[in-house]
Amino acid sequence: MGVPALFRWLSKKYPKIVERVKEDTPKKIRGPDGEIVEEPIRYENPNPNGFEVDNLYLDMNGIVHPCTHPEGRPAPETEEEMMVEIFKYTERVVNMCRPRKVLMMAIDGVAPRAKMNQQRSRRFRAAQEAADKEEERREAIKLFEAMGHAVSEETANHKSWDTNAITPGTPFMDLLSISLKYWVSHKLTTDPGWKDLKIILSDSSVPGEGEHKIMDWIRRQRSYPTWDANTSHVIYGLDADLIMLSLATHEPHFRVLREDVFAQSSKGPHACKNCGKVGHIAANCKSDKKFKDPNVAEVAKTEDPKPFIFLDVACLREYLAVELVVPGMPFPFDLELAIDDWIFMIFFVGNDFLPHLPSLEIREGAIDVLLKIWRAELPRMGGYLTNHGKVNLDRAQVILEGLAKSEDEIFQKRKDDEERQEHSQKRRRIEEHKRQDEDKAREEDRNTLTLNGTEYVAVDNPAATARGGPLHPSLPSRPAFDLVPKEDAVKQPEDQDQKAKKAMAGSNSDIVKNRKAIRMANMSAAQALKAELEGGNDVNVDDKKAIAQEGKEEDEAVVTVERTEDEEKEQLTKEEARGTLEEQGEKEGVDEEVVPPAIQTDEDEGEAPVGDATVAENDESTIPEDDEDPTHVPRKRKRGDSDGDEDSNEEDDDDDDDDAPPNPEADQPIPKKKLKVNADGTVDYEDDVKLWEPGYRERYYEKKFGVKLSEREFIDKVTKSYMEGLCWVLEYYYQGVPAWDWFYPYHYAPFAQDFRDVGSMDIKFETSIPFKPFAQLLGVFPAASRIHLPEPLQTLMIDEDSPILDFYPPDFEIDMNGKKMAWQGVALLPFIDQNRLLTALKSKEELLSDDEKRRNSWGDNVMFIANENPLYDLFCDKLYGLRAKDVSKPIPIDTKASYGITGSVLPDPNCVPASTFDTPIPSISECPDLNPNDSISVRYYFPRQAHPHRSILLRGYKPEPARLTESDKDWVRRGGQGGRRGHRHNGGGNGNVTGGPGMARGRYESGPPRTNGYQPPPPRSNYGGSSGYGYGAPAPLPSRPPVSSYGGGAGGYGYSNPYAAAPNPYAGGYGAPAPYAAGGYGQRPYVPPLPPPNPYSAPPPAYGRPPGGGYGYGAPPPRGGGYNPYPSRR
């Protein structure tokens, strides 16, 4: 989810929710022939973390990304090698958790249109970043060639792997799907610990985001009485929204697994990526950038694998049970609905579908601000903001009004904090530069020797490395430096240049005699080339001061999509200079190898989410900062020209139809600002909105939307669209996709002050279907990634006569929108016109091959089981046996044999029991054909949902022992002030718990771990075990009897408008809160209590239309919901 700092904020505010994972590692033993071999981990052993896991869910995109383009080490060379890395990583994660019932692996499929806008932005920016890096690599090669060295053809023609391939419908995703099927079959055949597992693979051909497909499966399963209310879940993934999704299931035994990104690397302290020295970061470095030989491949450094951590959702629920209690409420407290309100308020701060409100930044305490308003207004609202995934619009207006009162103060405080931070950073930078100068002076003192009144200095001796070291094996290496008088050292470069010129004009013998001088001249030429490539020249200190002064008056901005006329001339001059220097390098080159300095192309430090693309935030070529100008900012050339972008905007205007959503960016082009990216990823720019000054609303709407504040009708359209988005997101998290084609049609959010009459908004979502994979690729890919599309579709992205050419601007503007980091900027891309895109795609479909048509179709979930699983014989008999002929209707799963898992199955046409599974990666010798294959696969269909998801704990729930002490709770009630907050030192179910002052430490959850994955854990003593000490906190008593998921109590059922005011909460006592009923959002009639309608009441047609779940309220409930579990024959 789009809240990069959410995980850190949660772990600091609620420290006990984080546990370090205890992980078994393979032991090295001596084999039968005396060789050292690794003994595999015994999966069937008890979980070392002290608790057993029933179901493990893997958001596979969180595994694929770090395996295909890892940080800190070279990426795998081929896609087959990437598959092996994915296998290794997945097995490590599975061995940490050791699920006993279900392992579900979900890959992102076609996303809802609301998410595709964000995907489009990321992929365009990733392509732009890749182009910048490729340009820098080619410049480095030119520099190396100018030094007189050859660059291999392989190095010169090397192309980096395009990370945009990780998108549904590409050949890479097709390979990933079949490779995971192979690996799962291999594990079921060879690992006895997997024999009882049911593995569900939902690949990229099944519509929906990976984590939402997982949650949809959980919601459907828990709507049946066969579901175990005490099922323990773990979900792996890197997205912060997994925490919200886990809470939204109201399954209390849930943990989120992820890498500990804040763990200290085993490589030791980080070195500067500019100079390679320890003690400072690249942003504060004064040294020249290092260079490396482009022919030398990067070698991975050995380091310990990153540790993992659990985020304990049950513990987070304990914190929220304290945090969300409001004294003196006129209605009963319901923790489940209060948690829903808390989740909804986080959506205001950030999500993947809407830009966050300008006044809300999580780093500024935005969640606490909203929570404070919610606590103050909850008694007056008379009920909760949300109701089982529906928003009460009248109550949402109350929260927005409370935020509106604070917006001016928030903006002013933000400006004060930024100025204070900038002053502090400038002071630290100056101090760091002073320290570097002192270190440099000490180094020079060490390299200076006074002898007989003459001062000698050490100068580099390239001859020491010219031929690789010693003259003869019996002789020592040449020294790496010479001692020369200081006066001669100053004149030496000049003399070397003169010698080189004379030698090159002479005979071959002159060249040989003066090869040292020629080599030094080549290196000088290379330095000149570097200065030209970086937009600078070799100048003295006084000249640098003049340039720095000039720079204050001239525009040095970079990372824009347009070049000015002056910049075009400057670029032409640079190209001429490069050509001259290259020619000089070829003429003056000698046949000797010189080990050059390293060419640094790594990214500098900057904070950005895993897998998030940035716009040249870290890879700019930099000019070394002058000692007397520590705040000098490096420059970067601009890319692209303005004509293409202007044309595309014109086409957008001409082709917009009346049915398309409003697109103010197309109607009112925003003046493009020029950006300047620093070494640390921050951006220097002029903020022309100035939210901290009076009149900011007028400036904001004029700059961002191209309208005046007085145009109230337009602003009302923006606020309604935004409120639609909030309702869409909440329902997406709780009930499934409301509408696949809905999206927020603006790049910016309105102010809280501008929402009015929210309760009267008529919000409806119409039923729709997801895109096909190739339609999504055309909707999110830039033209640079067209190689992943079939050839007939590639022309739509580049041909001048393409009807959708304007969807693929070669350059685009990044608006920083008040942010500091480059990756936080807003990519101002034109929104896709769905009708035009689908029409263009249809015109090319006849040209697709059969295999390409298969890739462009929806697929099925697949379930794998081993031959020892109780379901194996049933599947073979009913699906693959002699009596199983022409099976066309899905067969229900026997819930007794599946331990409560429901659904239906059909034969997998790619599976023949007991046959050989051909390897999809034949180039990998460790992955041969699988023979015999002791597993079986079937097409698996999720069960229809028996009733809408409800925010309650299921009957039979058994609470875990309390994590929080009374001291912890008091600390939370005080808002984290006073006392000492508790935290966990060790991971696992029996980590140490530290309370506030004077509290004894004890081990909770002592006693034997669960050994049976299918039974609830035995009662555990709170008074320690053999390994514990002290006393643990007793388990809390439930505030009221568990409420049945099927009714329980006489709760006040429904009012036809789920977003209207609720009836008197006292009407039904402690019954379940009122779920929603079908009806228009803006209508307010009250109806007598009725059972909640079931949008899943009629089973979906076995092969009907794909979902929508997105029915209009007021219309009859649709058949099915979420996404269609039977997509194969749509």
From Swiss-Prot:
Residues 617-629, 643-660 have a biased composition (Acidic residues). It is found in: Nucleus. Residues 411-448, 533-678, 965-1036, 1072-1130 are annotated as: Disordered. Its main location: nucleus. Residues 987-999 have a biased composition (Gly residues). One of its GO terms (cellular component) is nucleus. The keyword Isomerase does not apply. A zinc finger (CCHC-type) spans 270-287. PROSITE patterns: ZF_CCHC. Its EC number is 3.1.13.-. It comes from the Eukaryota. Residues 121-147, 412-441 form a coiled coil. This is 5'-3' exoribonuclease 2. It comes from Cryptococcus neoformans var. neoformans serotype D (strain B-3501A). The gene is RAT1.
